[in-house]
């Protein structure tokens, strides 16, 4: 068996096209285009790349993208004041603050200051809590994107044993909640987990998000399992690899996300979907 690649680039383009059609219909109906505010503090090169891709994606689908590039010397008070301003801006449907933030700024304070109905990253405790209670509104982008990928490939989740490796607030924890909602029996593994291999070997679906190259040996993957690799790591050679040993895993899996071109593009596609949802549901007068 050789696994079928799950093509995140293709699916993300489909999602963007669907959103672009909805934007066009809104504008033709005399309604304003959705607006996204993207806030970058400091000059972290990786953050600049991510922010650039998000801004381009917005413009492609017809959103109004407002950019706020702040110096690394920006204080927490100044950043919170900007968020207050954006919360009150009737033409902004989503507020995205690129993480990580410089030392001296508490990311929790910042994320909690964003109005839950403009929290298009899905990080606000209110939105995570809604997901936990099975009534999601704005959902965390990477886990939402993964669910979209699995859905578009008609991969049945109900009744499957899913193992999530990694327990971060951005991916692992909300991913666990998404999989519970989808009907999986879900195990979350983290740095204190004993016998990681034993857990992975039992999984019908493995989602790995630890940020360590080739962390999960391909031979651990059960025959016919689905592998979702969230990691993106650059080796000294310059090659990009995931958190799973791809070539070996592909011999056992039924479906696998490649790196690059798997999960990555779906994160931005989900951000676009969330902004559209916020605009239609929360900021359009019925």
Curated annotation (Swiss-Prot):
Known catalytic reactions: (6R)-5,10-methylene-5,6,7,8-tetrahydrofolate + NADP(+) = (6R)-5,10-methenyltetrahydrofolate + NADPH; (6R)-5,10-methenyltetrahydrofolate + H2O = (6R)-10-formyltetrahydrofolate + H(+)
Pathway(s) this gene product operates in, as recorded in its UniProt entry: One-carbon metabolism; tetrahydrofolate interconversion
Binding-site positions, NADP(+): 166-168, 232
Keyword Hydrolase among record annotations: yes
A GO biological process held by the record: methionine biosynthetic process
Record keywords, A-Z: Amino-acid biosynthesis, Histidine biosynthesis, Hydrolase, Methionine biosynthesis, Multifunctional enzyme, NADP, One-carbon metabolism, Oxidoreductase, Purine biosynthesis
Gene Ontology terms: cellular component: cytosol
UniProt EC number: 1.5.1.5, 3.5.4.9
One GO MF term attached to the UniProt entry: methylenetetrahydrofolate dehydrogenase (NADP+) activity
InterPro entries found in the cross-reference section: Aminoacid_DH-like_N_sf, NAD(P)-bd_dom_sf, THF_DH/CycHdrlase, THF_DH/CycHdrlase_cat_dom, THF_DH/CycHdrlase_CS, THF_DH/CycHdrlase_NAD-bd_dom
Pfam families named in the record: THF_DHG_CYH (PF00763), THF_DHG_CYH_C (PF02882)
Protein purpose: Catalyzes the oxidation of 5,10-methylenetetrahydrofolate to 5,10-methenyltetrahydrofolate and then the hydrolysis of 5,10-methenyltetrahydrofolate to 10-formyltetrahydrofolate.
Subunit structure: Homodimer.
HAMAP family registered for this protein in UniProt: THF_DHG_CYH (MF_01576)
UniProt similarity note: Belongs to the tetrahydrofolate dehydrogenase/cyclohydrolase family.
PANTHER family: C-1-TETRAHYDROFOLATE SYNTHASE, CYTOPLASMIC, C-1-TETRAHYDROFOLATE SYNTHASE, CYTOPLASMIC-RELATED
Name of the protein described by the UniProt record: Bifunctional protein FolD
Primary gene name: folD
């Amino acid at each position: 068996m050789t696994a079928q690649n799950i093509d995140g680039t293709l699916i993300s383009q489909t999602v963007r096209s669907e959103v672009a059609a909805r934007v066009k219909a809104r504008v033709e109906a005399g309604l304003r285009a959705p607006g996204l505010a993207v806030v970058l503090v400091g000059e972290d090169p990786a953050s600049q790349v991510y922010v650039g891709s998000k801004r381009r994606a917005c413009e492609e689908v017809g959103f109004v993208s407002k950019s706020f590039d702040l110096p690394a010397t920006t204080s927490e008070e100044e950043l919170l004041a900007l968020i207050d301003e954006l919360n009150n801006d009737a033409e902004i449907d989503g507020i995205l603050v690129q993480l990580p933030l410089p030392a001296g700024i508490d990311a929790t304070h910042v994320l909690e200051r964003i109005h839950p109905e403009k929290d298009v990253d899905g990080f606000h405790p209110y939105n995570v809590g809604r997901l936990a209670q099975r009534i999601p509104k704005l959902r965390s982008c990477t886990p939402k994107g993964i669910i979209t990928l699995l859905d578009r490939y008609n991969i049945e989740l109900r009744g499957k044993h899913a193992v999530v490796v990694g327990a971060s607030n951005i991916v692992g924890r909300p991913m666990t909640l998404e999989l519970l909602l989808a009907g999986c029996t879900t195990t979350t593994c983290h740095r204190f987990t004993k016998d990681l291999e034993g857990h992975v070997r039992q999984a019908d679906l493995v989602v790995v998000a630890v940020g360590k190259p080739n962390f999960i040996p391909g031979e651990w993957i059960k025959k016919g399992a689905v592998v979702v690799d969230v990691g993106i790591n650059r080796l000294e050679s310059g090659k990009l690899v995931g958190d799973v040993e791809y070539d070996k895993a592909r011999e056992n899996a039924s479906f696998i996300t490649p790196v690059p071109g798997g999960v990555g593009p779906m994160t931005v596609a989900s951000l676009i979907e969330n902004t559209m949802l916020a605009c239609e549901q929360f900021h359009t007068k019925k």
